[in-house]
Amino acid sequence: MYKKIEIFTDGSCLGNPGPGGCAAILRYKQHKKEFSIGYRLTTNNRMELMAAIIALESLKNPCQIILNTDSQYLLHGITQWIHIWKKHHWKTSEEKLVKNIDLWQRLDVAIQIHSIIHWNWLKSHTGHPDNERCDQLARLAAKCPINEDFY
């Protein structure tokens, strides 16, 4: 039987590009774990992707996951576009490499071990406690970036 994990993610960027942060909250029964990390120069979309990546990579065993995000970019990318990109060797319809290909490929690997992942969109800033907490953690991480990134 797989553990049922609920994940909340968010990314933040102070300027776009600029310093950024990402955060994730993982819930399993009564347990809760928070992650956040800041980058010196990045974009909002890269931070949304990194939030999901750090959450999924923290899980060492296959799980059933509900991943909540307020990012349409992440949601549409992982549920619709990624299949097309992979089929076309990570190129867009204009024959250009997919933006943030490094993170999309990393996310693609991270989702492979899990039995079920349900991707759920949450409207941001509507008062959901875990979504609001992720937003707060991501903004704090963006204010104190410790890692290099590139966009």
Swiss-Prot record:
<keyword id="KW-0460">Magnesium</keyword>
<dbReference type="InterPro" id="IPR050092">
    <property type="entry name" value="RNase_H"/>
</dbReference>
<dbReference type="InterPro" id="IPR022892">
    <property type="entry name" value="RNaseHI"/>
</dbReference>
<keyword id="KW-0378">Hydrolase</keyword>
<feature type="binding site">
    <location>
        <position position="10"/>
    </location>
    <ligand>
        <name>Mg(2+) 1</name>
    </ligand>
</feature>
<feature type="binding site">
    <location>
        <position position="70"/>
    </location>
    <ligand>
        <name>Mg(2+) 1</name>
    </ligand>
</feature>
<keyword id="KW-0255">Endonuclease</keyword>
<feature type="binding site">
    <location>
        <position position="10"/>
    </location>
    <ligand>
        <name>Mg(2+) 2</name>
    </ligand>
</feature>
<comment type="function">
    <text>Endonuclease that specifically degrades the RNA of RNA-DNA hybrids.</text>
</comment>
<feature type="domain" description="RNase H type-1">
    <location>
        <begin position="1"/>
        <end position="143"/>
    </location>
</feature>
<dbReference type="GO" id="GO:0043137">
    <property type="term" value="P:DNA replication, removal of RNA primer"/>
</dbReference>
<feature type="binding site">
    <location>
        <position position="135"/>
    </location>
    <ligand>
        <name>Mg(2+) 2</name>
    </ligand>
</feature>
<dbReference type="InterPro" id="IPR012337">
    <property type="entry name" value="RNaseH-like_sf"/>
</dbReference>
<comment type="similarity">
    <text>Belongs to the RNase H family.</text>
</comment>
<dbReference type="GO" id="GO:0000287">
    <property type="term" value="F:magnesium ion binding"/>
</dbReference>
<feature type="binding site">
    <location>
        <position position="48"/>
    </location>
    <ligand>
        <name>Mg(2+) 1</name>
    </ligand>
</feature>
<dbReference type="GO" id="GO:0004523">
    <property type="term" value="F:RNA-DNA hybrid ribonuclease activity"/>
</dbReference>
<protein>
    <recommendedName>
        <fullName>Ribonuclease H</fullName>
        <ecNumber>3.1.26.4</ecNumber>
    </recommendedName>
</protein>
<keyword id="KW-0540">Nuclease</keyword>
<comment type="subunit">
    <text>Monomer.</text>
</comment>
<dbReference type="Pfam" id="PF00075">
    <property type="entry name" value="RNase_H"/>
</dbReference>
<dbReference type="GO" id="GO:0005737">
    <property type="term" value="C:cytoplasm"/>
</dbReference>
<dbReference type="InterPro" id="IPR002156">
    <property type="entry name" value="RNaseH_domain"/>
</dbReference>
<keyword id="KW-0479">Metal-binding</keyword>
<dbReference type="GO" id="GO:0003676">
    <property type="term" value="F:nucleic acid binding"/>
</dbReference>
<dbReference type="InterPro" id="IPR036397">
    <property type="entry name" value="RNaseH_sf"/>
</dbReference>
<keyword id="KW-0963">Cytoplasm</keyword>
